[in-house]
Amino acid sequence: MRHYYSVDTIRAAEAPLLASLPDGALMRRAAFGLATEIGRELTARTGGVVGRRVCAVVGSGDNGGDALWAATFLRRRGAAADAVLLNPDRTHRKALAAFTKSGGRLVESVSAATDLVIDGVVGISGSGPLRPAAAQVFAAVQAAAIPVVAVDIPSGIDVATGAITGPAVHAALTVTFGGLKPVHALADCGRVVLVDIGLDLAHTDVLGFEATDVAARWPVPGPRDDKYTQGVTGVLAGSSTYPGAAVLCTGAAVAATSGMVRYAGTAHAEVLAHWPEVIASPTPAAAGRVQAWVVGPGLGTDEAGAAALWFALDTDLPVLVDADGLTMLADHPDLVAGRNAPTVLTPHAGEFARLAGAPPGDDRVGACRQLADALGATVLLKGNVTVIADPGGPVYLNPAGQSWAATAGSGDVLSGMIGALLASGLPSGEAAAAAAFVHARASAAAAADPGPGDAPTSASRISGHIRAALAAL
């Protein structure tokens, strides 16, 4: 499990170490880890460290000190080291002295011969975009295609929200210390490496699943299981206008677990043509017993669609609401707020704005939490980084790592997957987070098939790669 910590939590954990260690020892410990990772990056890119050139772009304060100490350690390993001081009067004095003593050079700009740039401009206590001088330096670095290693966070990106409101550093690698911060999931930080500096960190409720976490939770049939005990998923989706939504949603539910899927709606003929294992009926009342309902994809907002939504929410079963269901729900939020059974809402940004009365804005975690608490429902906010908030509970962050899932019908596939996990008995937040993780893996696999490179994919192909993504966990 990945844990993401606030700046205040990190600072509180650093305090006892700073009080007990000799002055500067914690900075040098962090910088040594940073230099080690930079050395690995240099070796991977250029074949070694000796004779290579690094340049630290140094701001005021400890972040710049980390960068200077790392450059000093690399200098001792045989690299040439330069430093651009953005604020010479406020540069970390001890780190600067060590850097110059090691033979490091102070320069006005980054040389075109530089193999790697160290971003030591702004640390986790900073905020806002790059100031003009730093922005100019990194614009030149980007134009020259020199890779950047960021110290703790890429400068110019908000540490708590991942928001970028102006010029910011584009990092190939970010090396962070002690614990991950939300920005490492919410923004593009390149590859992220965590260096252990000995912090004793308190509890965090901002989490991220890893493959082992998903594998441990995904239902696997046991020797006493049958199609009913594994969970029966009910799907209320599709219409004469959008029958494909029903096909995609039910197909994903079929692929996600080994139980049973029941479908009710006007697209039952199309569903059976694609998935003969589905039990299909024309109305929800005729569907039979299920353990969870998925309602909304392609459903329409007419009287029949409203009746299906009301039917599902009136049960004491877990319910996932998506797409047209969310559009109708925006006018009747009390239908969810009054439920005792688990409810999962899966809006994109536009649907979120209708539900919450305002778009999520830069603070997607805070906005998702607020809506989940207000409605008493698990909220999954779609995006390249999926944010899942449990009411009064944890938030799960799932960075997809690519954008191949941004295709029509992809959300219908995700809804079917989550519904199947709800039917299996998984708690709503974990079901949403696990499904989002596998959905992202399936999207990447679909884009990579048949290879050798990635290519545009579709929701049907994403659904077709769910099983492969599960098998690879």
Curated annotation (Swiss-Prot):
Keywords assigned: ATP-binding, Isomerase, Lyase, Metal-binding, Multifunctional enzyme, NAD, NADP, Nucleotide-binding, Potassium
Chain residues that bind K(+): 63, 119, 155
Family annotation (Gene3D superfamilies): 3.40.1190.20, YjeF N-terminal domain (3.40.50.10260)
Cofactor note text: Binds 1 potassium ion per subunit.
Cofactors that this protein relies on: K(+)
Residues reported to bind ADP: 382-386, 402-411
Record-listed (6S)-NADPHX 1 binding positions: 152
UniProt EC number: 4.2.1.136, 5.1.99.6
NAD(P)H-hydrate epimerase: region residues: 1-211
Region (ADP-dependent (S)-NAD(P)H-hydrate dehydratase): 211-473
Top-rank taxon, per record: Bacteria
One example GO MF annotation: NAD(P)HX epimerase activity
Reactions catalysed, as given in the entry: (6S)-NADHX + ADP = AMP + phosphate + NADH + H(+); (6S)-NADPHX + ADP = AMP + phosphate + NADPH + H(+); (6R)-NADHX = (6S)-NADHX; (6R)-NADPHX = (6S)-NADPHX
Span of domain YjeF N-terminal: 10-205
Family: In the N-terminal section; belongs to the NnrE/AIBP family.
NCBIfam families linked to this entry: yjeF_cterm, yjeF_nterm
HAMAP family per record: NADHX_dehydratase, NADHX_epimerase
PANTHER family: ATP-DEPENDENT (S)-NAD(P)H-HYDRATE DEHYDRATASE (PTHR12592:SF0), ATP-DEPENDENT (S)-NAD(P)H-HYDRATE DEHYDRATASE FAMILY MEMBER (PTHR12592)
Entry function: Bifunctional enzyme that catalyzes the epimerization of the S- and R-forms of NAD(P)HX and the dehydration of the S-form of NAD(P)HX at the expense of ADP, which is converted to AMP. This allows the repair of both epimers of NAD(P)HX, a damaged form of NAD(P)H that is a result of enzymatic or heat-dependent hydration.
Name the UniProt record assigns to this protein: Bifunctional NAD(P)H-hydrate repair enzyme Nnr
Lineage, uppermost ranks: Bacteria, Bacillati, Actinomycetota, Actinomycetes, Mycobacteriales
